[in-house]
Amino acid sequence: MSEVLDLSAEARERAGKGASRAIRREGRVPAVIYGEKQEPASIHVEEKVLMKLLHTGHFFNSVVMLDVGGKKVRTLPKDVQFHPVTDRPLHVDFLRIGEHTKVNVNVPVHFKDEELSPGLKRGGVLNVVIHDLGLSVDAAEIPEEIVISLKGLEVGESIHLSQVALPKGASAQDHEDITIATIVAPSALKSAEGEEAAEAGEEAAEG
């Protein structure tokens, strides 16, 4: 299960661009808490602490417990706006949730048992189609990752959504049996990349 992240916050008295710029100059990031049929709450958080949480790699599929003036608020991060040049966070949206609220999250997909794949042993290449899997899951049971075994996979074989073991109580947001990954021959991969490059060249020539 993904760990619960803690983040201190302070209520934001003033709104507007001028107030937000002033907050950022103090090393803080404006944010808002919304949802659960309650009024949105304007807050701000420390930029350095927020950056540490963003660098965990699982910020968006973790419950974040906000401490707003001593009051604990259970939330799920929904969006972070970044500066286009400096890449510093400009604003954060937090969705207020209950302990067992059903939430939609994108969970990273990881693979194991590469050494047990005959296709990879013969020089095949793992072509990952889906890097994050959209799940609908209990907020208290959000997985940190979905691990998929490559055991027994030959060149030309694929892993589909229907073959992936999801955590108990979780369901995929995508109802189609999408392809997660495929073992391809190196020549097939190079051919596909060559075709894409050729198409890009043709489009550039036409444009």
Curated annotation (Swiss-Prot):
Pfam families: Ribosomal_L25p (PF01386), Ribosomal_TL5_C (PF14693). GO terms for molecular function: 5S rRNA binding; structural constituent of ribosome. One of its GO terms (cellular component) is cytosolic large ribosomal subunit. It comes from the Bacteria. InterPro entries: Rbsml_bL25/Gln-tRNA_synth_N, Ribosomal_bL25/Gln-tRNA_synth, Ribosomal_bL25_b-dom, Ribosomal_bL25_C, Ribosomal_bL25_long, Ribosomal_bL25_short, Ribosomal_L25_dom, Ribosomal_uL5_bac-type. GO terms for biological process: translation. Keywords: Ribonucleoprotein, Ribosomal protein, RNA-binding, rRNA-binding. The keyword Ribosomal protein applies. Belongs to the bacterial ribosomal protein bL25 family. CTC subfamily. Part of the 50S ribosomal subunit; part of the 5S rRNA/L5/L18/L25 subcomplex. Contacts the 5S rRNA. Binds to the 5S rRNA independently of L5 and L18. This is one of the proteins that binds to the 5S RNA in the ribosome where it forms part of the central protuberance. This is Large ribosomal subunit protein bL25. It comes from Rhizorhabdus wittichii (strain DSM 6014 / CCUG 31198 / JCM 15750 / NBRC 105917 / EY 4224 / RW1). The gene is rplY.
